[in-house]
């Protein structure tokens, strides 16, 4: 039996703490997988994956990003990262978790999995700290047009002049998710997440999944995404690091696979060589709770084991 340990760890932002978990397998720890979750969700949603992988000897750990899940002081913190540089704070917290976990399990192969917003942070992480990893899984990612992201970032800055960084703009939120539910209208606004309607309803019933990002968080996220358009930044990624891209071919975040392929090409253009990709037919955005989630779990476990040799 695996051991699920809930933790509270310090953020790199003074005065802030992060909710985290560590799922420890029984017996030998063959590898560690650190998680970077998505926007407007929380890390405990990943516990079923963690328990599955622990059954294969893989320790899984992760924390709620600032402004998410249990990493809030009050509900006013939902969707707020940090000032003056929220993007840097999120990355620094991810790296602090890596350092903390490696101290507990020295010499054990170490991997990172990022989903959705967490995949954009994982891609930044690979450029800054990829030399500390043995591989990474990039899930539910995309490749947004640079001009659009720059416009959105500038808009956040302008709005913040008038409203402050903790303001929640419906316009920015609607722009960020524009068109995602196209063709699925009529039941909920979030059926693009998943073919499993019960999981969509569960998501919408949880206050940890229904808040609106502040201008601070949007600005921070857009700042990070823009870095992924910089060839000099991407060139810092270790060229031979094993990468696995996973996405549904009906996921609007990845433009039904087109955005995923563009993200991969941007890395290949930077000289990154060891990239695999799997698109799941009919699957939408949240692969870990999709109707084929067991297949996804098994693919993740098999890929990790393949890179332990």
Describe each model-derived feature in a short phrase:
Residues 1-27:
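N-terminal cap/lid segment of alpha/beta-hydrolase-fold proteins
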Residues 122-208:
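Alpha/beta-hydrolase-fold enzymes
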Residues 82-102:
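Alpha/beta-hydrolase active-site loop
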Residues 105-116:
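Alpha/beta-hydrolase fold nucleophile elbow
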Residues 245-247:
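Short beta-strand/loop motif that positions the catalytic acidic residue
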Residues 270-309:
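Catalytic active-site module of serine/aspartate enzymes centered on a nucleophile-bearing elbow/loop
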Residues 48-76:
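Conserved alpha/beta-hydrolase
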Residues 36-41, 116-117, 249-250:
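Active-site glycine-rich loops that stabilize anionic/oxyanionic intermediates
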